[in-house]
Amino acid sequence: MITGIGCDVVELERIEKVLQRHEKAFLEKVLSSSELETYHKRKAGNSKRGLAFAASRWAAKEAFSKALGTGIRDQVRLTDISVKNNELGAPYLVFSGELKELVQEMGLDCFISLSDTDKVCMAVAVCERKNNG
């Protein structure tokens, strides 16, 4: 049974301005350690790819927090959410810390879809209760 759906759209220009002013603080607040490493690799290759990566992770985490129904607070820390990609490039969510425990206690499977243009990144997240029987 679906327990929540969340959506977030972020303008790349907005994230670009934040990164210009507060790159280190923003990235350390938003990205997990593995995502931070990926961000720097992508940015080194092409600054636009780094920007799109940071924006898509922000959108994904906001969308997930909406699907969970809590927003970003208490046990939901941005750095405890990682967006990974499978071998075909499809994104999926990995949780750590208290958030991992919360998602397990709630019996949830959570899914994410990302899309972007040259101006915006968007994410849609769905949480559903696992069928245990």
Each language-model region and where it sits:
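Core catalytic alpha/beta fold that binds nucleotide/phospho-ligands
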Residues: 1-133
